[in-house]
From Swiss-Prot:
GO-annotated molecular function: protoheme IX farnesyltransferase activity
GO cellular component terms attached to this protein's record: plasma membrane
Gene: ctaB
Summary of the function given for this chain in its UniProt record: Converts protoheme IX and farnesyl diphosphate to heme O.
Annotated HAMAP family: CyoE_CtaB
Identification of the protein by name: Protoheme IX farnesyltransferase
Matching Gene3D superfamilies: UbiA prenyltransferase
Amino acid sequence: MNSLTKSINLDKVSYPQSTVKDYILLMKPRVMSLVVFTGFSGMWLAPNSLHPFISVIALICIAIGAGSAGAINMWYDRDIDALMKRTQKRPIVRGAIEADEALSFGLIMAFFSVFFMALCVNFLSALLLLFTIFYYICIYTMWLKRSSIQNIVIGGAAGALPPVIGYASVSGSVSLDSVILFLIIFIWTPPHSWALALFCNDDYKNCKVPMMPVIKGALYTKKQILIYSVLLFLTSLKPFFVGMSNIIYLVIAAVLGLVFLYYSISLFYDNADNKQAKRFFAYSIFYLFFIFLLLDFCRV
């Protein structure tokens, strides 16, 4: 039996009563935490001073916008989520929330996040938030994810936009500084996601999602991870050279980047199992959080 034909008819199952926890999980809280954190960094690194009320509203809107995109993503991907071990416990798959209910929830949150961003903050940040939600749902989830080996590379732009939104919410503009923040996340996303794809390769293959390890194999993927790791190392040093951060940032960012490179090289030469891919994946999360934390504390 074809793996896709084995997926559960999630629209016809009997659903138990939903809980608050189910709706929180529907919004992908781990992704939300990264989005909010990088969004705050964009706000903090903007040239203007932070307005307490507007800053809080902006962060809430960014969080709700990210949550809405996560909810609609789970609605659309419920068929393949049911087939993947990593996603089989998501709320729609296990019957905690109906598919139509999840879609309505996501759309309502998306509307209010953009509406209040425009009403209380500024139109530029609202437009950027709207574009980010649209890009993640329509360009990545509905189009690229299931059709292109470059799904993560191109689709990663959505995850890289929160600091730009945060920056625009304070400054009312987009500048070189915010573009550099975007580039750090944009270049970080492929190696991070491909490491996950390496140790979840069977799941992606089973669902016919054209992740790079599925189409090109592990060795080619590891080469790409190494290339992107070098690019990330170079990009992560740019904040110092454009006057965004001080020498402390440069030194620590260089060390973190070298460790990132070490893990990518170790992954490239690892032929045993997926342990090195899991180590690389775990470190990549730590790396991004710490780089943005450094930017916050070492700004000029």
